[in-house]
């Protein structure tokens, strides 16, 4: 299996620092956390069960449907776009290598071991990476971080003392938007408009002028 790791590193030619950390560090087993620079951590992602994350195929289809133009652009859009690009490239190289190893292994047991290792270990890490960066681009990084914390608190709370359903990421932005609207309301809306002031009757204007003189 060490030879498999070595082949992965040699074949995964990624030019950026994020990809180097992913291929040379994280998948190799070094103590490098690819989420730290985004305010999260591997431990925080580990609170989400493995069946929470969609398949790699679904995540790749989602990223292509939503961000194909930005991902294919030569320009730097955001750190999340860069990390997403390299995760997709690394997964493609990994699949190419796994296919090559599977075709050249004569022993069926060894072939199944390689396929199972890729799907259960590296596949889960890639699914976590893809989900995290797609979610940050879709809902915002702060919303995703709040969701991870909320889910972590929920899952660690004993069942008798927590809500029956886990938090849902898609509902958090709605709450955030409502709060921002309440905080962002301008006090000018409460004051009467200039039209209403002009439409006041002369009698009312006289009474107001008398009060101002007092």
Swiss-Prot record:
Residues 25-27 are annotated as: HBEAG. Coiled coil: none annotated. Residues 1-19 form the signal peptide. One of its GO terms (biological process) is viral penetration into host nucleus. Residues 186-214 form a propeptide. The record marks 185-186 as: Cleavage. The keyword Disulfide bond applies. It comes from the Viruses. Sequence repeats lie at residues 186-192, 193-200, 201-208. Residues 178-207 have a biased composition (Basic residues). Keywords: Disulfide bond, Host nucleus, Host-virus interaction, Repeat, Secreted, Signal, Viral immunoevasion. InterPro entries: Hepatitis_B_virus_capsid_N, Hepatitis_core, Viral_capsid_core_dom_sf_HBV. GO terms for cellular component: extracellular region; host cell; host cell cytoplasm; host cell nucleus; T=4 icosahedral viral capsid. Phosphorylated. Cleaved by host furin. One of its GO terms (molecular function) is structural molecule activity. Residues 164-214 are annotated as: Disordered. Pfam families: Hep_core_N, Hepatitis_core. It is found in: Secreted; Host nucleus. Residues 186-208 are annotated as: 3 X 8 AA repeats of S-P-R-R-R-R-S-Q. Gene3D superfamilies: Viral capsid, core domain supefamily, Hepatitis B virus. May regulate immune response to the intracellular capsid in acting as a T-cell tolerogen, by having an immunoregulatory effect which prevents destruction of infected cells by cytotoxic T-cells. This immune regulation may predispose to chronicity during perinatal infections and prevent severe liver injury during adult infections. Belongs to the orthohepadnavirus precore antigen family. Homodimerizes. This is External core antigen. The lineage of its organism: Viruses, Riboviria, Pararnavirae, Artverviricota, Revtraviricetes. The gene is C.
């Amino acid at each position: 299996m060490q030879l498999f790791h070595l082949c992965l590193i040699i074949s995964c030619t990624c030019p950026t620092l994020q990809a180097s950390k992913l291929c040379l560090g994280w998948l190799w087993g070094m103590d490098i956390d690819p989420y730290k620079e985004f305010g999260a951590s591997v431990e925080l992602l580990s609170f989400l069960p493995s069946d929470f994350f969609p398949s790699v195929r679904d995540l790749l289809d989602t990223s292509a449907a939503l961000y194909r133009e930005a991902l294919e652009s030569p320009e730097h859009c955001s750190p999340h776009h860069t990390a997403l690009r390299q995760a997709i490239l690394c997964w493609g190289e990994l699949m190419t290598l796994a296919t090559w190893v599977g075709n050249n292994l004569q022993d069926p047991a060894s072939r199944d071991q390689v396929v199972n290792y890729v799907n259960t270990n590296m596949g889960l890490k890639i699914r976590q990476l893809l989900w995290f960066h797609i979610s940050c681009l879709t809902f915002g990084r702060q919303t995703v971080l709040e969701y991870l914390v909320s889910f972590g608190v929920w899952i660690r709370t004993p069942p008798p003392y927590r809500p029956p359903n886990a938090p849902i990421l898609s509902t958090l932005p709605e709450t955030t938007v409502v709060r921002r609207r309440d905080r962002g309301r301008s006090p000018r809306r409460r004051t009467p408009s200039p039209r209403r002031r002009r439409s006041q009757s002369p009698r009312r204007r006289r009474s107001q002028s008398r009060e101002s003189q007092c």
